[in-house]
Amino acid sequence: MFRTMMRAKLHRATVTEANLNYVGSITIDEDLMDAVNIVENEKVQIVNNNNGARLETYVIKGERGSGVVCLNGAAARLVQPGDKVIIICYGLVAEENIHKQEPKIAVLDDNNQIIEMLGAEKAGTIL
């Protein structure tokens, strides 16, 4: 059996743009993608901390070092520049590997720079 497990997360990213007329997806600074091992065209879930909206889309590489987090297409209706979002990527893990799998979590500042890397979350942690 396989389970769907959280394998990567960009925590408290700041939306830099919302582009309604783009084809679709989310554009993410490639440095941030690399930090948590998210690849172009991979499916992600986005949770908007400001309004509670949740959506799924795929990733497009953004310029390295730019800090870009841009929601494109229909997703642009669910965010505003400045909103705080959590970008989560899941993967299928075989039952025998459940306890060996450790996610990569990057906690970001207001400029989408990594301030901390976590390997796991602990209950009651407030960031």
Swiss-Prot record:
It is found in: Cytoplasm. Binds 1 pyruvoyl group covalently per subunit. It catalyses: L-aspartate + H(+) = beta-alanine + CO2. The keyword Lyase applies. Substrate binds at residues 57, 73-75. GO terms for biological process: alanine biosynthetic process; pantothenate biosynthetic process. The active site is at residues 25, 58. Belongs to the PanD family. This is Aspartate 1-decarboxylase. It comes from Bacillus cereus (strain ATCC 10987 / NRS 248). The gene is panD.
